[in-house]
Regions:
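Long, amphipathic alpha-helical coupling/dimerization segments that relay conformational signals between
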Residues: 3-10, 24, 83-192
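Charged, compositionally biased N-terminal leader segments and the immediate start
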Residues: 3-33
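Exposed alpha-helical structural elements
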Residues: 17-20, 30-37, 62, 73, ...
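N-terminal "first-domain core" detector
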Residues: 24, 32-65
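Short, charged, low-complexity loops and linkers
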Residues: 28-40, 102-110
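Short, well-structured alpha-helical interface segments that form or flank functional binding sites
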Residues: 44, 48, 52, 73, ...
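Structured interaction and signal-relay segments at domain junctions
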Residues: 53-86
Length: 192
């Protein structure tokens, strides 16, 4: 709904796809407030998560070539990004940052598989940070609420980065979004 979108100061007037995504995703001001409240307690735990993430990436023959030459700077960038998931702000700048991330990935020739794998790792590991000991300090939030807020935000990040890949592919092929959608959803089988 527009109330959710406006409460986060994301202007979707010229972005129908983002408006539609956010209307289904449901990330709202209460989610943002939860993540921001947890941030000071979560922030010290994020460096270990970054290390675990890059250990996994470096162990992968498919992913290692994309990071091996700049692991230290990428770890710093990743850590700043994970902190932003909790600190915000969740506004037009947040949208622009994620579009920029997609553009950088394109320039670096980082495949969409990397983003999807990264987000899958975070969806599995980040909710583990919401321990009972941490949540005791925040009686207004339970594990399910905190996890839902975080997962909604990670999904939004992936949507914003992924669509940069699709937009680039459309530009490369010289096709419109409507044709791209038709090509993606058309069946290769002819009706019998």
């Amino acid at each position: 709904s527009k109330a959710h979108i406006m409460s986060l100061n994301i202007n979707t007037a010229n972005d129908a796809d983002l408006a539609e995504f956010l209307s289904h995703n449901g990330f709202c001001e209460a989610d943002a407030n939860c993540l921001q409240a947890l941030h000071p307690h979560i922030s010290p735990l994020l460096p270990a998560l970054t290390e675990a993430f890059y250990e996994r990436i470096l162990a992968s023959d498919a992913m290692r070539p994309f990071v091996i030459d700049r692991v230290d700077s990428l770890k710093q960038t990743h850590l700043r990004w994970m902190n932003m998931l909790f600190s915000g702000p969740f506004d037009d700048q947040f949208v622009q940052i994620h579009q920029h991330i997609g553009e950088v990935h394109l320039k670096q020739k980082i495949p969409p598989l990397f983003v999807a794998s990264s987000m899958a790792f975070l969806r599995a590991e980040m909710p583990k940070l919401f321990t009972p000991e941490l949540l005791e300090k925040f009686p207004q939030y339970d594990y399910a609420f905190c996890t839902s807020a975080l997962l909604r935000l990670i999904d939004t990040c992936q949507f914003l980065v992924d669509r940069t890949y699709y937009q680039s592919l459309m530009e490369l092929l010289g096709i419109s979004p409507k044709l791209f959608l038709r090509l993606m959803t058309s069946s290769s089988k002819q009706p019998a």
